[in-house]
Amino acid sequence: NRVSVLAMIEAARRLDRPEVNIHFAATTQEEVGLRGAQALGVDLEPDPVIALDTTVANDVSGFDPGKEITRLGDGAAIKLKDSSVITNHKLHRRIQSVAEDNSIEHQLEVLPSGGTDTGGLQRASGATPAGAISVPTRYLHTPTECVHESDLDAVIELLVATLETEDGDHDYTL
């Protein structure tokens, strides 16, 4: 998904001398078993890993508001779970705290169906502490995907703020 690659590149550009080694990477074959993410996780053995992806923004007319996943314009989506992963609770709480401490618009994401590379990265080297930040997107997997510019900005800001405050001393063990 191109918008997540844009967010990753922009976050990398904005980072100024982080305290830890950070690897930025993009994967392929998510839709056929998370193969790229699993291979990447084995090669890098990250600790922790934060995946970037898009997620469903289904805040459209006629849709039951109680079944909304995310809303356009409500900020970055911090993933709690999808069908491939339950994110590390210490990591997603830290990402949420960073958002709150920096007044970054955010919403929580629970995706009832569909998975992401987060699961492949988490399982690649045992139980790698994994979290994810998603860009709320309408019309996923179509040529007319739509995102809100403020959500994309929030994803970039949140990723940068999270990485800038990672010092290697956070305990993500369960």
Range-by-range predicted roles:
Residues 1-32, 158-159:
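Alpha-helical metal-binding/catalytic segments enriched in His/Glu/Asp
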Residues 29-36, 99:
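Glycine-rich phosphate- or other oxyanion-binding loops that anchor nucleotides, phosphorylated ligands
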Residues 34-38, 59-64, 119-120, 143-144:
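Short, well-ordered secondary-structure micro-motifs
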Residues 10-16, 42-44, 122-127:
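Alpha-helix C-terminal capping segments
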Residues 40-60:
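A glycine-rich helix N-cap at a beta->alpha junction
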